[in-house]
Amino acid sequence: MSSSSPILLMFIFSIWMLISYSESTDYLVGDSENSWKFPLPTRHALTRWASNYQFIVGDTITFQYNNKTESVHEVEEEDYDRCGIRGEHVDHYDGNTMVVLKKTGIHHFISGKKRHCRLGLKLAVVVMVAPVLSSPPPPPSPPTPRSSTPIPHPPRRSLPSPPSPSPSPSPSPSPSPSPRSTPIPHPRKRSPASPSPSPSLSKSPSPSESPSLAPSPSDSVASLAPSSSPSDESPSPAPSPSSSGSKGGGAGHGFLEVSIAMMMFLIF
């Protein structure tokens, strides 16, 4: 496990360097060809140029110059300040020097000629660590569609139900006149006819005091015919004899009428 750790670290470092170099930028010193030369437009022209950019690990700066008159030396800060051209420096004389910035911090470059360095032909760049690649922000989610207002559908018209046929009032049967039953006369037992008392000759009896006489034959026939009410079925009483008939044989005439009435009753 311990032997694999250095390999893993080197692999991670290689990947990191590869990513850094893939995002590196190549800068031309002074933004023009043959800008590494003397005299400069101003003494601080290269310092002003470097302040316009932000350098990161993996970037490349290129020096273009005339290699017959100029050279490039990578020095420490002390030699940069005093323009010391002697020491352990990295010297370039090819006329098209490309320097890869491999570590963070301040990198110092001076001219191979001390006089030119003092007149401003020198450069210091600040190198920063490459920013960590952040995953791009997710694309904004599309706005949620607003819920469409439901279109109100017209209510379905219910078909009118056919009116239920109302039961037609059945014509009530008119009361038919019930046939009046003719009372069948039952024969009555023959009772001995008692002679009606003869009225007193001294005073004529009043209608309430005179005995009711048997009905006449015409009245008996009428009582047998159908009548409109039960009261009609009873035989009407015979008229009382007038006071004038009570004189001169009234008793015999009354007995005769009673006999005739009894005979008619038995016949019918």
UniProtKB/Swiss-Prot annotation:
Localization per record: Cell membrane
One cellular component term from this protein's GO annotations in UniProt: plasma membrane
Biased composition (Pro residues): 134-145, 160-185
Region listing for Disordered, in residue ranges: 134-253
Residue intervals of the Phytocyanin domain: 25-129
Coiled coil regions in record: none
Signal peptide location: 1-24
Lipidated positions per record (GPI-anchor amidated serine): S243
Keyword Disulfide bond set for record: yes
GO molecular function list: electron transfer activity
Any GO BP: nodulation
Pfam families from the UniProt entry: Cu_bind_like (PF02298)
Domain of life: Eukaryota
Location (main, coarse): membrane
Propiece residues: 244-268
Disulfide bonds: C83-C117
The family this protein is said to belong to: Belongs to the early nodulin-like (ENODL) family.
PANTHER family (UniProt xref): BLUE COPPER PROTEIN, EARLY NODULIN-LIKE PROTEIN 10
Function: May act as a carbohydrate transporter.
Protein name, per record: Early nodulin-20
Species whose genome carries this gene: Medicago truncatula
Gene: ENOD20
